[in-house]
Amino acid sequence: MSNNVVITGANRGIGLAMCMHFKAQGDKVFALCRNSSTDLEELNVNVIEGIDVASDIGVDNMVAALSNVDIDVLVCNAGILRDESLSQLNLDTIREQFEINALAPLRVVATLQANLNEGAKVALITSRMGSISDNTSGGRYGYRMSKAALNAAAMSLSHDLASKKIAVGIYHPGYVQTEMVNYGGDISASDSAKKLVGLINQLTQDQSGVFKHSNGSVLPW
């Protein structure tokens, strides 16, 4: 059975690769992004440009484009990484990461909740860097704090959407070879996306609100 799958941040990296894997299994993919890419256009999915999930106009564009779409799977993947240290704090980049990594996914889910079918799935692409107990190296203040906030929002969503039997998956993709980390990761975007799509396929109500690595292991908060 084909699902309607909506993915944010879909023009490159993990988002692009997830579009590819969902399409390969027969799903109808709606790829949301600010600007498309050649690689995304070649996938022959439904590309919706002009979607900046951190802006009012971008969210309005999203609502208009998806007004008649019943969503089975919603993947909030858009995110950014900036670098701050204790000696070089930049409150502007910390705020920017909160807007895009934490507030925007929550806003996307809240705005599209009327489009979500009963029994739908919401996947939030987070990071183990948002784990408090797993933080053994410090630094990366904005990224760590914003992903911890996303994890907290995801847990609340898992409770608030339960009445519609909507399951919420909270996923760390791994250290992925993407532009965000200058391609210095240890797993390709395609391999990570394949694992994530597999986890989303298997997501059930009893696993809602569980923080998982793309390899399937449960991560600590």
Describe each region flagged by the PLM.
Residues N77-E84:
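Conserved NAD(P)H cofactor-binding loop of Rossmann-fold oxidoreductase domains
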Residues I170-Y171, T178, N182-W221:
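C-terminal helical subdomain
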Residues L43-I57:
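Rossmann-fold cofactor-recognition segment
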Residues S85-I94, K121-A162:
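Catalytic loop of short-chain dehydrogenase/reductase
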Residues N11-M20:
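N-terminal Rossmann NAD(P)H-binding glycine-rich loop of SDR-like oxidoreductase domains
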